[in-house]
Amino acid sequence: MAGRRLHGRASFICGKAGAGKTTLARELGGTLPAVVICEDEWIDTLGFEIRSLEDFVRASSKWRSLIGPLASELLRLGVSVVFDFAGNTIKSRQWVRAVFEAANADHVLHVIDATDTQCLANNHRRNHEKPSGVYWGHVTDETFHGVTVYFVPPQPEEEFRILTHVRR
């Protein structure tokens, strides 16, 4: 239909390391349908060397400047997008908001409610199994606790449409 504009939906995920963000992103990508955009995969493919959290933050910033306009265009054209990255800070969620608002698209913030004990156990299992598609590497207990200090659950004043996934 000429002149008709469809807009996709942006889905993104908030959860601690080991909560199951990538697993949920893949599930969503297969059921919505949607294009899954995996930050870790892109950073790896683009050749960024990640040896520290600081390296990851720098690479992530460059990745976002590259992928943001593309994701907005996909959404504007009616393609739904699942962001497989940690929407764990207010700043990271503001970035996604800018992407979907630029496309006048809908959104859902998927929040994974998992205990630290569950996340640590999942990280231990993932470190042992080394499944394909996991690019951040070995997540030690020290790394988990180091990145968890930056975790900020979504606040009501952020005004996101939230769907909570309880992992107990």
Where does each model-flagged region fall?
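Conserved substrate/cofactor phosphate-moiety recognition/catalytic segment
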Residues: 19-79
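Hydrophobic anchor at the beta1->P-loop junction of P-loop NTPases
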Residues: 13
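Walker A (P-loop) ATP-phosphate-binding motif of ABC ATPase nucleotide-binding domains
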Residues: 10
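NTP-dependent small-molecule kinase module
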Residues: 1-5, 31, 148-168
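Conserved nucleotide-binding/hydrolysis micro-motifs of P-loop NTPases
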Residues: 41-43, 113-119, 168
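A glycine- and Lys/Arg-enriched "phosphate-lid" helix/loop adjacent to the NTP-binding pocket
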Residues: 102-152
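P-loop (Walker A) phosphate-binding loop of NTP-binding proteins
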Residues: 16
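Glycine-rich phosphate-binding loop used to anchor ATP phosphates in small-molecule kinases
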Residues: 59-103, 107
